[in-house]
């Protein structure tokens, strides 16, 4: 089975959300119908080139994301003082800016997830199959490991002495504080993803899909401003895993579970909130 262009909609699944756009959608909004949910398993995807192309796009995007952001974090730590570097604001801009750019580049190929927590949230909302979700997460983690690995390969000594961008709970904060920061931070991100890519909003306003990367990147920026002092900001299990594996010091693994459990809980809460409260999908008429 050959890959088709309709595979590359948001979520990159076999169930595109085709709706009228612009002002023509205003009068037909009452006729809007929810797109069918993606199946739990879609074996046919495994024979489609677009499936593997999407996975490669996720790998490359996460690779570039880790490469740029880890270098930025190292640059800040290497400076003699905060005034001599871009500081926390610069780190936040690097993370948010890279997400903005990479989502823009890959949205038409894979949906531009670049984050297992985002993929998990979209899977819970039935925007993509389990087959695709697992494949994306594997490719994202591999991309993150390679991205951090290239940084270490280019600068081995600074990488080890400057922490390698690994996430840990900062001194003075409890594990509960770190977990809470990761849950709420990921909730903000995934809720923004749902809102920015909502099919019904896209039907009413033609500019929504084009602008989607902007609020997503801005959400990442704001979450980093708030939580860098607490956990270094994970909200992306692949980002945390890649840095931890390549840095590979004991303290980088002590709290590593927080950077998986927190983002997955936050993503699940965002998916439930958007689907049940905002969209009220379970309460809509079946007729």
UniProtKB/Swiss-Prot annotation:
Disulfide bonds: none
GO terms (BP aspect): response to water deprivation; water transport
N-acetylmethionine found at: 1
Membrane topology value: Multi-pass membrane protein
Cytoplasmic side stretches: 1-55, 114-133, 197-209, 279-287
Ranges where the record places region Disordered: 1-36
Tissues in which the UniProt entry reports expression: Predominantly expressed in roots and green siliques. Also expressed above ground and in flower buds.
NPA 2, short sequence motif: residues: 236-238
Database matches in Gene3D superfamilies: Glycerol uptake facilitator protein
Subcellular location: Cell membrane
Motif interval(s): NPA 1: 115-117
Pfam families to which the protein is assigned, alphabetical: MIP
Entry-annotated residues carrying Phosphoserine: 285
Record's GO cellular component terms: cytosol; plasma membrane
Residue ranges that the UniProt entry lists as topological domain Extracellular: 77-92, 155-175, 231-257
Residue spans crossing the bilayer: 56-76, 93-113, 134-154, 176-196, 210-230, 258-278
Function: Aquaporins facilitate the transport of water and small neutral solutes across cell membranes.
Protein name: Probable aquaporin PIP1-4
Native organism: Arabidopsis thaliana
Gene (name only): PIP1.4
